[in-house]
Structure formats: C-alpha cells, structure tokens
C-alpha cells in the first residue's frame, strides 16, 4: 500500500465569511465557513485550507473564532494561512484548533520567520505558500509574486522554495497564478520542478476545472491537490475527484 493522495478544498475567509473574488478583489459573500467545512468533511476531504483574506487587523479575532468553531465540528487537518507574521500568530492559530499554518508574504519579507516557526513548533506545522508566475526574469522561468499575483518580488520561485525548505518549511503549497481561474488544468511543469527540489510534500493549486485535471498533477509529483471554486460551486464534489483518482490507479482515502 502506498501513501494515499490528498484532496484539499480551500476556503477564502474574510471577516468570518467565505468569499469569492478574483485575486482577492471584488470579494462576494459565499456563506458560512463552518457549513462549507462540514460539507467537505462529509464528502471525504482529506484536509481543509482556510486562507484569511481579511484586509484589516480588526477582523483577525473573527478568524480565530472561525477556526475554533470549525475545529470543534470537523475532525480533519486544518491549515490556516493569510496574515501570519509572527510566532505569536502561529501560537494563536494552533491554540484555536489549526493543525498547520501557512506563511507567504511575511516569510518573503523576513525569511528568518520560517526558521523561528519551525524551531518553536516543528516543520510539520509550517506550510510555505507560493504564488508563482511564469517569468523570463528568473533563471528557472518561475517567479514568486504577492498580492494575488499582481506584485513581482524578483525572487526565483525554485530558489526561494529551496531556501525555505532549508530554513524549516515542512510542506509547499504551490499556486500557479497563470493557471488559477482558467479551469484548464494545473501547471505540470511547475509541479515537476518543485518536486525535484526535495522530499518535502508538494500541494498543487491553481487550474482545476474537471475531474481529469487532478491525476496529471499527482503524476507530475504533487502529494496533494487543492481547489476552491469548482468545489464551492458544486461543479465537482470531493467524491467525484476521488472516484476519478481511484480509476486512474491512485490510492485515495474513502
């Protein structure tokens, strides 16, 4: 028996509600995150990812409440990212019921944060999120961006991922800005390049549109696949994806 692949729905949460927008702009209310989480757990999700897209510090406490409420009702691993800037933020999220914490722009601004979190809580808690765009300006052809892909950092995505792994990142959440929202499949070259860096688990994100899109991402080297809008809209269920993966010869949890 091999290791089962993971299917992970992602919820963008702002001020305690699930929202949908394009690159964090024009956010529209989609509903209660606890209800979404319960539904996905019932469908067989292996994990859940919450991304806090709240713009203001005032609403951060609402996010902790949402995490607490979700963790009290849903018993699958929960990763929370967005706005994590310190080990204190991580401690509060873990104390609220998160199992793992995602860091992105704060780690780019201060890479030492990765080591601080890993040293205090363990690498297994730390997910490095990367929003990656194809770019001729980097050696690998892939650049790290922030602000939903609108701001280029000048960092080579593969170099940054390798450095973060050295500092203690225990997992990579790799989101293709180019593929995101296209529903035309994941960026397989990007996944292969990230897989070649190390044995650290890779979560592929960006581009899922149909059940046939998921198996190629896993064959390219991803350990898990993440999607948002196709699940929220009801176009696909977690079960649909797992059925397709099992038919493709992959081991999935029920």
Curated annotation (Swiss-Prot):
GO cellular component terms given for this protein: cytoplasm
Active site feature: 12, 131
Record has Amino-acid biosynthesis as a keyword: yes
Location of this chain's protein in the cell: Cytoplasm
Annotated CDD domains: HisF (cd04731)
Keywords from the named record: Amino-acid biosynthesis, Cytoplasm, Histidine biosynthesis, Lyase
InterPro entries recorded: Aldolase_TIM, His_biosynth, HisF, IGPS_HisA/HisF, RibuloseP-bd_barrel
GO molecular function: imidazoleglycerol-phosphate synthase activity; lyase activity
Pfam families: His_biosynth
Catalytic reaction equation(s): 5-[(5-phospho-1-deoxy-D-ribulos-1-ylimino)methylamino]-1-(5-phospho-beta-D-ribosyl)imidazole-4-carboxamide + L-glutamine = D-erythro-1-(imidazol-4-yl)glycerol 3-phosphate + 5-amino-1-(5-phospho-beta-D-ribosyl)imidazole-4-carboxamide + L-glutamate + H(+)
Gene Ontology terms describing biological process: L-histidine biosynthetic process
Transmembrane segments: none
Pathway noted in the entry: Amino-acid biosynthesis; L-histidine biosynthesis; L-histidine from 5-phospho-alpha-D-ribose 1-diphosphate: step 5/9
Its EC number(s): 4.3.2.10
Family listed: Belongs to the HisA/HisF family.
Function: IGPS catalyzes the conversion of PRFAR and glutamine to IGP, AICAR and glutamate. The HisF subunit catalyzes the cyclization activity that produces IGP and AICAR from PRFAR using the ammonia provided by the HisH subunit.
Subunit structure: Heterodimer of HisH and HisF.
Protein name per Swiss-Prot or TrEMBL: Imidazole glycerol phosphate synthase subunit HisF
Gene transcribed to yield this protein: hisF
